[in-house]
Amino acid sequence: MSSAQSSIDSDGDVRDADIHVAPPVEKEWSDGFDDNEVINGDNVEPPKRGLIGYLVIYLLCYPISFGGFLPGWDSGITAGFINMDNFKMNFGSYKHSTGEYYLSNVRMGLLVAMFSIGCAIGGLIFARLADTLGRRLAIVIVVLVYMVGAIIQISSNHKWYQYFVGKIIYGLGAGGCSVLCPMLLSEIAPTDLRGGLVSLYQLNMTFGIFLGYCSVYGTRKYDNTAQWRVPLGLCFLWALIIIIGMLLVPESPRYLIECERHEEARASIAKINKVSPEDPWVLKQADEINAGVLAQRELGEASWKELFSVKTKVLQRLITGILVQTFLQLTGENYFFFYGTTIFKSVGLTDGFETSIVLGTVNFFSTIIAVMVVDKIGRRKCLLFGAAGMMACMVIFASIGVKCLYPHGQDGPSSKGAGNAMIVFTCFYIFCFATTWAPVAYIVVAESFPSKVKSRAMSISTACNWLWQFLIGFFTPFITGSIHFYYGYVFVGCLVAMFLYVFFFLPETIGLSLEEIQLLYEEGIKPWKSASWVPPSRRGISSEESKTEKKDWKKFLKFSKNSD
């Protein structure tokens, strides 16, 4: 067994252990690099960052992450629209017995869910633009599509079907952003900050939800179409922020190297790290990315068929991406965010809009905590603690709703004390969700796949998120109308399944580059042992030597056992 292996076995925190360092290794390729250059990656230190360095990184990444604001804004304003009188008058039905307009369960479900259908399709359609046009231009295109959808919705008048068509197109753009923005963030972010920077996407989603709640709260007393058209009109401001921002942010160095644009790739890495393109750290990063690209090319051209490859572990990662994004919706979060105003009116609150603003505030500030800690705690711990915390809160929320909210039956008055308790545990639930699953699910999907199939795999994973959001958004009015707060127990069962899946199947990737994550999967490390895995480059051995050493060690153990 090598000295590197001994160090791994004897040290608990092996990723930071003082381990054997290999001598410089000559490069075996020359695409875009000086043939005489020697890359001694183990001895190259990352650039030291002061306050200005961190500020530059976050400012460059923020316009990309603002793509998360678009679906968040829709969630916030839609939750208010379904309770607005003028909106119901324009797109609802008239009830002669009461003399009021209302939205049927079908129409309400479609109003909420059509956006999700558009997002699912948009992610699948537009993700491939990232490989042909680049990440930045692809984001600009999907934002323009989003603006077209907003125009169709605003121009709708007493035509609910026109509004729904606009909602789908609106979703196409937002869905494209849900794939492209985390993708670009994960590819330009420094390894030690990647989790927090990808989490900015979710932070902006919560910011969009919060401001959406505030906008409908501000327009709810208008007695004309401005009640809902003003919040929709603000979409153009958010879209312009993203388009202008794309002029300032660097392109993905991985995309640039795949296109043989090596100088631009080094400039991109240098810009995000605020150093010279000739800095040794920049050369090392470009060298590692180039190695990964060349290794992927040796496997042939990318295809949809490759997503089902067992040999390269892509299928395993695709299943993980699909399940993590599915579980994100099965936490039950959109039960509160889409129908929050309606839910809290049912617990006796006269102004559900105000409660929605409170929930939006908790959601936003909790996500700020996630941005700060996700690169310190790790992905697995965040997801495990989050599932356990949400499970406890949902059990209490559902139990109070079932047993205590209506002490004299569903037709009787609600208990104010029980209603207040439900709001408190809803806030605890949102805290657990926003600090864990909300950002980490996007991180896991953004960093799990090799660049060769990344756009395809991310689009499928994210489409599953939107598909489940559609199902929950559409069927929730029917389910709650039938089983009321027993619905919460359905999500409890899902949370139990989530906890078990993460523990047994999801590896830890904190502190690893995207290329090192590829090696983690190739070596077949058990997920519950993955936190102590050390990349070959830090052990002082190559990837091939690592695989050979692992096989030899297994043979040695088998021989020893037979000898006994």
Swiss-Prot record:
Subcellular location, record wording: Membrane
Origin: domain of life: Eukaryota
Annotated TM spans: 53-73, 110-130, 137-157, 168-188, 195-215, 230-250, 334-350, 357-374, 382-402, 425-445, 463-483, 485-505
UniProt xrefs under PROSITE patterns: MFS, SUGAR_TRANSPORT_1, SUGAR_TRANSPORT_2
Membrane topology annotation: Multi-pass membrane protein
Compositionally biased residues, Basic and acidic residues: 541-551
Residues in compartment: Cytoplasmic: 1-52, 131-136, 189-194, 251-333, 375-381, 446-462, 506-564
Chief localization: membrane
GO cellular component: endoplasmic reticulum; plasma membrane
PANTHER family: GALACTOSE TRANSPORTER-RELATED, PLASTIDIC GLUCOSE TRANSPORTER 4
Name the UniProt record assigns to this protein: Hexose transporter HXT13
